[in-house]
């Protein structure tokens, strides 16, 4: 994308944010059917933030005051490799709606960074999209259940490796 095109899109996004800001005063969960129709990559974007915040909160509970240690731990939990491993173990317990979102996210056209394999990145995108779906549709109990299970899976992997 060229710089001028980027600047134009950024300004358009700011205009939309201003419009949305005047129309909405707080977050209101959408119905599952509304969220299923959303772009899977956008759900993954939200899911990435939700899971990152969850992991940061868990790590901060340890009362470690060294930010470098905290950052390293968080990075190991939220990297594509860890998320992919967790997703592979969680995939069998996903609901039909969650499987639909995961499949769409996995098959989306995303640029894979050099730090992970295509499979890992696609699985982690699917995992994040499921979390984004649950967050956006207000399914907090299910969201917490999957994040806790993913956390436990990753923690076991880190303690053995």
Describe the residue ranges of each PLM region.
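Double-stranded RNA-binding/processing signature
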Residues: 1-161
